[in-house]
Amino acid sequence: MGSIEPPNASSCLVYQTITEFADFPDHDQKLWWHSTAPMFAEMLKVAGYDIHSRYKALGLYQKFIIPFLGVYPTKTNDRWLSILTRYGTPFELSLNCTHSVVRYTFEPINAATGSLKDPFNTHAIWDALDTLIPLQKGIDLEFFAHLKRDLTVNDQDTAYLLEKKKVGGQIRTQNKLALDLKGGEFVLKAYIYPALKSLATGKPVQELMFDSVHRLSHQYPTLAAPLRKLEEYVHSRGTSSTASPRLISCDLCDPRQSRIKIYLLELNVSLESMEDLWTLGGRRNDTQTLAGLEMIRELWDLINLPTGILSYPEPYLKLGEVPNEQLPLMANYTLHHDDPMPEPQVYFTTFGMNDGRVTDGLATFFRRHGYTHMLQTYRDSLRAYYPHVDHDTVNYLHAYISFSYRKGSPYLSVYLQSFETGDWPISSFGAPILEPVSKKMCRGHPVSFEVPLTKQQVVASE
């Protein structure tokens, strides 16, 4: 009997087929495709998207998103560092495991990003939106335009920050986009980080964010009640609170349906802190909240996050650097038009933890709660995304696990390292060769993460 082939995302037919016919305007775009598309294609398949939706999603990604990812990251090149990942890479895939929804987030980057024309990447997002709006009905920018005007730097702010040399090691990302893939359609979301605006104006991030949403609630009064509740909770934590507002997001749809989400960073990594975030300090105590709380306690035991007071680490990790760090907790609160109470979502920050143990914890959760498909596929899919890493020791694949509880059902998502996937480490992309070995390949860059790589493996891959 022949041996069973181990799972490998580079074998995904949709990825291979698009590769045959795709036109890449430059070398960087080709590298981005072969680094990320195997995992993307495999994730869509595992999540149960039909073949037409998979081709459409990957085709859109190849043609319209990759051009906004900038130069392909290597250990030596000069590139824009994005807050999206600890390695500064501007693209991340995530999977809602309980409802089988794939999403990806990216920070739009263009030729002006980081230059004197746009030193803080304020404007590239508009070019990306101009590209995406014709592709999906119903995109509306009203909430985004309001928040962006209030919370990202304008030309005057930019000149001030440059003149006073205010921005040293400060994280420079100001905005990013996410696409939730629903069948053959997508739902677009935007995220804004006001840290640079705070630096330019001298106003705290918390004040900037809440004031902006307050002004928005004058036009949309249904946002006022949940905003007041959230603001009350944040203020009740006091001036020495370990939790603070960090970013804000909105749906790019009809403002009457668009949700505002306000994110808090919690430096005290403990179950007690997560319980406080989930219940808004005891303000949420309904049956659904308490049912979700029991699952949070279960996940806490299964994932076993190390506890302690943690700051967000600086600077970025170098490509290929194995993390020796842990991130603070995070939570977001959705302001719904029809609910006076903010809806919480909490984040288990698993980056830096052993991915095998994280996977074991998730598998136990899937088994206990009847998510049979995920139980049967999750471990193999992770191995397919990264077939050349040691899954017993690797500790940088799971960045976050998010949890919320709605309408009697858990919503659990994983946010995963999405870089150098599939056969990248042993292909002509990962191995330093001078010329392409086929029309599918191109001159390679050194692989970022160390993997066992023998001459025989390279020859076999050719």
UniProtKB/Swiss-Prot annotation:
<dbReference type="InterPro" id="IPR033964">
    <property type="entry name" value="Aro_prenylTrfase"/>
</dbReference>
<feature type="binding site">
    <location>
        <position position="193"/>
    </location>
    <ligand>
        <name>L-tryptophan</name>
    </ligand>
</feature>
<feature type="binding site">
    <location>
        <position position="347"/>
    </location>
    <ligand>
        <name>substrate</name>
    </ligand>
</feature>
<feature type="binding site">
    <location>
        <position position="259"/>
    </location>
    <ligand>
        <name>substrate</name>
    </ligand>
</feature>
<feature type="binding site">
    <location>
        <position position="345"/>
    </location>
    <ligand>
        <name>substrate</name>
    </ligand>
</feature>
<protein>
    <recommendedName>
        <fullName>Tryptophan dimethylallyltransferase ifgA</fullName>
        <ecNumber>2.5.1.34</ecNumber>
    </recommendedName>
</protein>
<keyword id="KW-0808">Transferase</keyword>
<keyword id="KW-0017">Alkaloid metabolism</keyword>
<dbReference type="InterPro" id="IPR017795">
    <property type="entry name" value="Aro_prenylTrfase_DMATS"/>
</dbReference>
<dbReference type="Pfam" id="PF11991">
    <property type="entry name" value="Trp_DMAT"/>
</dbReference>
<feature type="binding site">
    <location>
        <position position="189"/>
    </location>
    <ligand>
        <name>substrate</name>
    </ligand>
</feature>
<comment type="function">
    <text>Tryptophan dimethylallyltransferase; part of the gene cluster that mediates the biosynthesis of isofumigaclavines, fungal ergot alkaloids. The tryptophan dimethylallyltransferase ifgA catalyzes the first step of ergot alkaloid biosynthesis by condensing dimethylallyl diphosphate (DMAP) and tryptophan to form 4-dimethylallyl-L-tryptophan. The second step is catalyzed by the methyltransferase ifgB that methylates 4-dimethylallyl-L-tryptophan in the presence of S-adenosyl-L-methionine, resulting in the formation of N-methyl-dimethylallyl-L-tryptophan.</text>
</comment>
<dbReference type="InterPro" id="IPR012148">
    <property type="entry name" value="DMATS-type_fun"/>
</dbReference>
<comment type="pathway">
    <text>Alkaloid biosynthesis; ergot alkaloid biosynthesis.</text>
</comment>
<comment type="similarity">
    <text>Belongs to the tryptophan dimethylallyltransferase family.</text>
</comment>
<dbReference type="GO" id="GO:0050364">
    <property type="term" value="F:tryptophan dimethylallyltransferase activity"/>
</dbReference>
<feature type="binding site">
    <location>
        <begin position="83"/>
        <end position="84"/>
    </location>
    <ligand>
        <name>L-tryptophan</name>
    </ligand>
</feature>
<feature type="binding site">
    <location>
        <position position="246"/>
    </location>
    <ligand>
        <name>L-tryptophan</name>
    </ligand>
</feature>
<feature type="binding site">
    <location>
        <position position="103"/>
    </location>
    <ligand>
        <name>substrate</name>
    </ligand>
</feature>
<feature type="binding site">
    <location>
        <position position="261"/>
    </location>
    <ligand>
        <name>substrate</name>
    </ligand>
</feature>
<feature type="binding site">
    <location>
        <position position="92"/>
    </location>
    <ligand>
        <name>L-tryptophan</name>
    </ligand>
</feature>
<comment type="subunit">
    <text>Homodimer.</text>
</comment>
<feature type="binding site">
    <location>
        <position position="263"/>
    </location>
    <ligand>
        <name>substrate</name>
    </ligand>
</feature>
<feature type="binding site">
    <location>
        <position position="191"/>
    </location>
    <ligand>
        <name>substrate</name>
    </ligand>
</feature>
<dbReference type="GO" id="GO:0035835">
    <property type="term" value="P:indole alkaloid biosynthetic process"/>
</dbReference>
